[in-house]
């Protein structure tokens, strides 16, 4: 064997050793397929539930030589004011996803405890549990995408955290508040209930934030990624009672929010910008209504599901054909065909009116 082949063999052995050194559950892990990771040569991106246009803020550019605060106090205060809670109820995180991970790491013993979630729903609950070595239990939503409370009650053994999403991603519907209340009652003293409200700005009256004062095991996930149009900022929040926030604070990284992110988040939460966000949200909801009506008359579209978020779930005669045809035209949607109970379904982020019109015209041409 010459030196070159010997070097290649040794290199391959090194790679194999690095892989086998990783935890077994990580070796077997199928990572979350984010919209950007799925790629595509898109010109119209409607697959990540992002806001279609970017806000304009100016960085202050100061104190970049210093580590940030453990919790950016101006952001904490501003979000507490916005959400109508005390600063003691707020923890700022790197996006809503970090809040999900923190809660799992804080409350679940690896290989012993489990989380429970209700598919079809957001995929990061399962991925975050798997990376932490925590078991997952699933209780599918009912045919109308509501909680199956009797089955949840039957599967609570060893469950430390229950995740629900309202409005639910990818279906877009709200969970019944009465069901969330029942869930809180059957889990009291047993598990943390996490209500993911990433899309709540599109239906603020449906928030369960009023339940915080009576349920110490309730945690709410929020984000600036959706209605605030700051997905690139990576800024989210956990809202909960002070005892729960204090426990999470033990686990969170010492400097989680970079100074520039905190700067922009504080600007985004000023009353003047909140008013702008609310006005733009109404414009987007108008686009959603237009898109839903336009899709309903297309021969390829069998159903447009009711949505309270910034996206629509549609069922097609041939979802794969529709998805592929639009992909090839640079219109990138989110294929849901492999998701539980969502065969031939596609999720479409509501974009600008021009983008919505192009989606409708493109689907109209699919045979």
Swiss-Prot record:
Cite the EC number: 2.6.1.9
Cofactor list: pyridoxal 5'-phosphate
This entry's Gene Ontology molecular function terms read:
histidinol-phosphate transaminase activity; pyridoxal phosphate binding
Q: Name one Pfam family in it.
A: Aminotran_1_2
Q: Does the keyword Amino-acid biosynthesis apply?
A: yes
Leader sequence range is none
Leading EC class: transferase
Report any one BP term from Gene Ontology: L-histidine biosynthetic process
Reaction(s) catalysed (UniProt annotation): L-histidinol phosphate + 2-oxoglutarate = 3-(imidazol-4-yl)-2-oxopropyl phosphate + L-glutamate
Q: How does it assemble?
A: Homodimer.
Q: Which HAMAP family match?
A: HisC_aminotrans_2
Q: In which pathway does it act?
A: Amino-acid biosynthesis; L-histidine biosynthesis; L-histidine from 5-phospho-alpha-D-ribose 1-diphosphate: step 7/9
Which UniProt keywords are given for this protein, alphabetically ordered? Answer: Amino-acid biosynthesis, Aminotransferase, Histidine biosynthesis, Pyridoxal phosphate, Transferase
Transferase is among the record's keywords: yes
Query: Species lineage, top-down?
Result: Bacteria, Pseudomonadati, Pseudomonadota, Gammaproteobacteria, Pasteurellales
Q: What is this protein called?
A: Histidinol-phosphate aminotransferase 1
- Cystine links in this protein are none
- InterPro entries xrefs: Aminotrans_II_pyridoxalP_BS, Aminotransferase_I/II_large, HisP_aminotrans, PyrdxlP-dep_Trfase, PyrdxlP-dep_Trfase_major, PyrdxlP-dep_Trfase_small
Q: Which residues carry this modification: N6-(pyridoxal phosphate)lysine?
A: 226
Family membership noted in the UniProt record: Belongs to the class-II pyridoxal-phosphate-dependent aminotransferase family. Histidinol-phosphate aminotransferase subfamily.
